[in-house]
Amino acid sequence: IRPLIPLLIAAGILLGGNGLQGTLIALRGAQEGFAPSTIGLMGTAYFGGFLLGCLAISRIMKAVGHVRAFSALAAIASAGTLLLVLMIDPATWSAIRFASGFCFAGLFTVIESWLNSGVANRDRARVLAFYRIIDIGAVTGAQFLIPVFGADGFSVFAVMSIMITLSLVPVSLGDRSNPVPPADVRLDLGRVWRISPVGVIGCVAVGITNSAFRTLSPVYAEQIGMSVTNVVTFVSAGIVGGALIQYPLGYLSDRWERRAVLLLTTAGALGAALALVFFAGSGPLANFVLVFIFGAFAMPLFSLSAAHANDRA
């Protein structure tokens, strides 16, 4: 794992910057008077760019290699972060978020393909588990930079740009090998549907739900009267809940009927979401507990749906 340490450091810095951006966009947008629907559309733009980036990055890596692809995409993402605070306008922010989604999809693909190519099969699960720990830790920790620097000024945007730029250093100075790029992606949604309608419906529904949570949960928390510190704690509680329960639910679904686990997990997420609606005014602690439970049930649903589809592939 030692040769991969620079790459994992870069991943941690980059993931922290990306996780910080999602929450900050929602908070700053609300402060600027953007409607929740407008902030939601910005989230849609980000994930649209992310989808396109997933489809295009293999060609970029084949053309210029991993290091150059990473450097170019990180530079664009860093510049876009600064443009957010220089050009405060919903349409401009949506365009920047689309470009950011494209860049971050490419950056994560570069990192993950590099990790996979640089580790033996016997060590792969441990390395990827360590990567996921870094992911959750960086995203959760970065949230608390918002109350430190404030969401209403330039400083926190500069910090995000610095984090994205610094991720270039370990990649540029670390392992100079050039792994084989991933194969081109071809979508055949009809075939996927024929293999597992339940898996397709689950992945699509969970993708919509969880992306809406990541985009709009800061706005919801602010509108029910939470302070900035409590807003980022609320968002972090949902993320941590999903991280902690991923493995136990995966373990259960490997041993029980997977559709039954999917049904029970969906019911748990629905119950927690309804409880959040009814107990919104009950104080921060109740909301932290409920959003933790929501994340614990909602976040693993994608993995469970994908596993169900893979069972039939």
Where are these regions (language model features)?
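C-terminal membrane-cytosol helix-exit motif in multi-pass small-molecule transporters
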Residues: 147, 161-181
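Helix-loop boundary and gating motifs at the non-cytosolic
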Residues: 1-47, 197-202, 210-220, 224, ...
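Structural signature of the two symmetry-related core transmembrane helices
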Residues: 68-82, 161, 260-275
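C-terminal transmembrane helical hairpin of 12-TM major facilitator-type secondary transporters
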Residues: 259-303
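Helix-to-loop junctions at the C-terminal end of transmembrane segments
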Residues: 53-66, 150, 245-257
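Cytoplasmic helix-loop-helix junction between adjacent transmembrane helices
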Residues: 98-133
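Intracellular juxtamembrane helix-capping segments at the cytosolic ends
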Residues: 106-119, 299-313
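Short hydrophobic/alpha-helical segments at membrane-entry points of transmembrane helices
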Residues: 7, 91-97, 199, 283-290
